[in-house]
């Protein structure tokens, strides 16, 4: 039997071995289960042009699959908007929810490979993006920052939203957790 069969992703191992203890000391938790943890990462890509051309949505789904390693689900319009030629129930985007090993592997690639490739990147805003309940949302303007996407094979540059859902009770706890995972906050 291989010793790597049940190996944890690098960041998950670091969380279990080092970060849990650090966060417990920093916030003075009495119980180890109180320590905030990353529960899921949601990637969302809105494709407005999909209303007129479903091929654009299919291309976005393919790109999201390559980036996340998991097939996304198409999101449907909740209500009709005549000005944008959108009918209720029309597919206009895609999203994928990453948990467990895939979540930690995506976070590792995001922090070590994708973020350094963002042009004029000076870090994430320290006080924006938190929702007051321990979750953090950020946006990426170009999907080409991920090395899995080949620049020659894309039809359009698309952005995406990345939402980090944590078990933290406050924004300060969530920020400390994400900072411990090396997310580059500028403040």
UniProtKB/Swiss-Prot annotation:
A biological process term (GO) from this entry: translation
Keywords per UniProt: Ribonucleoprotein, Ribosomal protein, RNA-binding, rRNA-binding, tRNA-binding
InterPro entries: Ribosomal_uL5 (IPR002132), Ribosomal_uL5_bac-type (IPR020930), Ribosomal_uL5_C (IPR031309), Ribosomal_uL5_CS (IPR020929), Ribosomal_uL5_dom_sf (IPR022803), Ribosomal_uL5_N (IPR031310)
Record carries keyword Calcium: no
Pfam families assigned to the protein according to its UniProt record, in alphabetical order: Ribosomal_L5 (PF00281), Ribosomal_L5_C (PF00673)
GO CC terms, sorted: ribonucleoprotein complex; ribosome
SS bond partners: none
Record flagged with keyword tRNA-binding: yes
Superkingdom: Bacteria
Its biological purpose: This is one of the proteins that bind and probably mediate the attachment of the 5S RNA into the large ribosomal subunit, where it forms part of the central protuberance. In the 70S ribosome it contacts protein S13 of the 30S subunit (bridge B1b), connecting the 2 subunits; this bridge is implicated in subunit movement. Contacts the P site tRNA; the 5S rRNA and some of its associated proteins might help stabilize positioning of ribosome-bound tRNAs.
Stored HAMAP family: Ribosomal_uL5_B (MF_01333_B)
Subunit structure, as described in the record: Part of the 50S ribosomal subunit; part of the 5S rRNA/L5/L18/L25 subcomplex. Contacts the 5S rRNA and the P site tRNA. Forms a bridge to the 30S subunit in the 70S ribosome.
Protein name per UniProt: Large ribosomal subunit protein uL5
Native source species: Gluconobacter oxydans (strain 621H) (Gluconobacter suboxydans)
Gene that encodes it: rplE
């Amino acid at each position: 039997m291989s010793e790597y069969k049940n190996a944890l992703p690098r960041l998950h191992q670091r969380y279990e071995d080092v970060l849990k203890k650090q966060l417990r000391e920093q916030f003075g938790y009495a119980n180890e289960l109180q320590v905030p943890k990353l529960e899921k990462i949601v990637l969302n890509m809105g494709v407005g042009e999909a209303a007129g051309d479903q091929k654009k949505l299919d291309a976005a789904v393919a790109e999201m699959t390559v980036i996340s390693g998991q097939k996304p689900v198409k999101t449907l319009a909740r209500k009709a908007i005549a000005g944008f030629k959108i009918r209720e129930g029309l597919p206009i985007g895609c999203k994928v929810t990453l948990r467990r090993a895939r979540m930690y592997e995506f976070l590792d690639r995001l922090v070590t490979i994708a973020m350094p490739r963002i042009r004029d990147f000076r870090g994430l805003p320290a006080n924006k993006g938190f929702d007051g309940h321990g979750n953090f949302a950020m946006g990426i303007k170009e999907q080409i920052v991920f090395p899995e996407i080949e620049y020659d094979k894309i039809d359009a540059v698309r952005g995406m939203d990345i939402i980090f859902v944590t078990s933290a009770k406050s924004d300060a706890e969530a920020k400390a957790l994400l900072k411990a995972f090396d997310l580059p906050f500028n403040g």
